Amino acid sequence: MRSALRVGIVALACTPLAGCVVGVDSQGQIVREEKRFSVDGAPDLRLTTFDGAIELRGTDGGQVLVEIEKRGPTREAVDELKVEATQEGRRIDVEVKRPARERMVFGINVSTSAKLIVSVPRHATILARTGDGGIRIEGVEGRLELRTGDGSIHVSDVKGELVLNTGDGSINVDRAEGRLTLETGDGGVNVEGNLTVVRMHTGDGSIVYRADSATRMEDDWEISTGDGSVSIYLPAGFSAELDAHTGDGRIRNELDVATNIERDRDSGERDRRTLRGKIGEGGKRLRVQTGDGGITLRAR
């Protein structure tokens, strides 16, 4: 107990006095517990769960609150899920582990999982990982790295360096500022914000990117999908060196792109598989690619 107090951790054990919540629903047994951490400044938070969603929300104050919702077919199975929590200064690690061999319960089709619901100061460094489950984050500024083996990622009202990765699932980013790197093996991508660096890829899915009015490129952008359409909306005054290509589809361009290819005067569009040229004053490269699908470039 003394060591826990030294690092500022309050762990709630599963006893009536500790306030641990135990319940039962159609998804089996549920046990909820909390862990609290006090920090001076921006925390460096590492979250890991083997299976389960992760939800993070930025709040005022200097505390990190991690609520852990453990589920399983029986109370014994839930109790075997181990929560490891440590703190060293601003560095906080919380990991939920399942036993090496899970219990088999005949007649109950419920596997074990552990969902994390986290309140964190608005300025933070975060690494959140789940083997299977969605991740949501809202209202946080800093380096934010979110990874899931199978599940969607939703991001809103964030600022900083964003790294998003899912093996199978959609990615949605709303009202973001900073640098963005994202990848999904299979899923659609929808992004809106004021981003200076953009690197997006999906193996199979459409991409929609809406750049805010103040958007300016600080480095080359890469936007690609193996199979799906790409739609990009750019503000007035935006400048880039465009390199767009589709393996099977057409490019519909409504921007003023300076090229050596004459404009189709009848339609006011350029319908082709490759389009290269300057947008505005040119500058950093904007590379847009799809293996199979159309590309649409429009003013916002």
What are the functions of these language-model segments?
Residues 1-300:
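Intrinsically disordered, low-complexity terminal regions
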